[in-house]
Amino acid sequence: MCKIIIATAHSAKNLKQTIATAWTYFNQTGESDGFGAVWIDRAGKLCWIKSSTPNLGQKPPRFCFGFADNENGDSPSNGGFLLIHGRKATCGKSLENTHPMLGSGSALIHNGIVRSSTIKNAHTTCDSELLLLAMAENNERRLAEITGYFAFGMIQPTAAGWQLHVAKDDTARLQAGPNKSGGFTFGTTPEACQIAGAEVSHTVKSQTLLTFTSKTKHTTRKIPKAVQAPTPAKTWLDADNFKEWPMRHGSIPAAQQHLFADELADEQEAMQ
């Protein structure tokens, strides 16, 4: 099982420490097949990092600290939405399967295993991208047709600004509580919530989609339960063709993708 941390607001000044603490926690609890985080910068752009190798290793890599406060004391984050993911692979130990999943200018992290009979032509080797596709299309019917179990967070652009979606089904674990930055934190465990400054106060309601437009302002929508039987994996896995799916490629300018390409390359070389 993967672990996720979702925050509607966070301490921009302490972003590097939050990332490093999450890395350490996930490594200690067995989510050591990949790591990633995504947030919005001060210019309103989507920024993200992924682990340079599928296995985390014992110490936080340099890129966990490389995007910290600059010489002027400014943070690269606007202190708003933040997603962090530690991966325990069920299939596909590769960087391509490491979260966040990116597409249509959006970013998603997910815990669980999902299937779909209607998105079988997605040509993806990662089930999380089925959720990304359904959410990017703003299609509740597609989301309702996904079976399995899931808890996810997704940052999505709109004409009015960024939105954060949070949801879980009736099986996956997702707890929540108010955090020290004036927003809310959601996490797989109480310890995950504490990393982003929150003490758990309740469990997230099942089959409900929360959509935040700010650190506290949000709407709720009910997600109908899927009614069809789970689809065999072979109907939606296509390892030979997944790169043809436009959801994975070209949606985010290269300059925004890896802010610290040199650090990532150095770290990957050092771990080989």
Regions found by a protein language model. Give the residues of each.
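Conserved short alpha-helical segments that host acidic/polar catalytic motifs at enzyme active sites
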Residues: 1-272
